Amino acid sequence: MQHNKENHFVEDAKQFQEKAKLYQGNYYTLDGELITIIPSSKEGFRSCKSLYYKKKQPIPGR
């Protein structure tokens, strides 16, 4: 699994459940990051990719 500037990983499944909420079939963290669930039972990582507003501006604090 690769790690780059646009992605970081949520390690714990419980932490994922606490931070994520479902919106239109996708999981988002509370600060507005889209979570893509990677089907890997061994590692259990989930990648988070930053979302952008309609104005194409990055999320504040990122």
UniProtKB/Swiss-Prot annotation:
Superkingdom per UniProt: Eukaryota
Name of the molecule in the record: Putative uncharacterized protein C13G1.16
